């Protein structure tokens, strides 16, 4: 079982990166699996469209240690989201190799999972960074928004350069 707010956060923070490309169908969902993070087990959701990657962790729910990794389809994520508004609700999650079930006291949502292998997303995440910076999320979002307005429609890229005491955004 997992609290509704935990599942809501996992899917809300990862769904923006779900691919809509039909040729790489295995990217058309959120990869939900148990992983190690700094010495403890976590429930991790990952999504990517090949350009953006979202990875979000939550404490591993009791009894989930043997859960197989599954790719939850985009449509299922959307339908499930409608069930997760009650903060006091516990969601019973059952997973097999081919299906996933989310059950509330009143509603059960069962879905096939995507039959495919999610790519090794850890290979694209830089390791051993010597420079790190913490920024206020809302200030950062506003700055990216301002710079993105002058980026080209084709690339929509915003470059980040970390200097000694500041972060410079450019197109």
Regions picked out by a protein language model, each given a short descriptive name:
Residues 1-171:
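Structural preference for solvent-exposed beta-strand-turn elements
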């Amino acid at each position: 079982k997992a609290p509704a707010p935990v599942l809501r956060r996992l899917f809300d923070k990862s769904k923006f990166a779900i691919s809509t490309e039909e040729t790489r169908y295995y990217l058309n969902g959120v990869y939900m699996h148990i992983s190690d993070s700094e010495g403890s087990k976590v429930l991790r959701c990952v999504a990517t469209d090949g350009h953006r990657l979202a990875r979000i962790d939550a404490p591993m729910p009791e009894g989930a240690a043997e859960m197989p990794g599954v790719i939850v389809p985009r449509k299922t994520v959307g339908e499930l989201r409608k069930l997760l508004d009650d903060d006091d609700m516990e969601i019973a999650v059952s997973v097999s190799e081919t299906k996933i079930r989310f059950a509330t006291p009143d509603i059960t949502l069962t879905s096939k999972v995507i039959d495919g292998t999610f790519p090794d997303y850890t290979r694209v995440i830089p390791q051993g960074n010597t420079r790190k910076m913490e920024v206020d999320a809302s200030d950062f979002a506003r700055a990216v928004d301002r710079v993105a307005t002058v980026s080209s429609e084709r690339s929509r890229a915003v470059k980040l350069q970390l200097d000694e005491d500041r972060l410079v955004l450019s197109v």
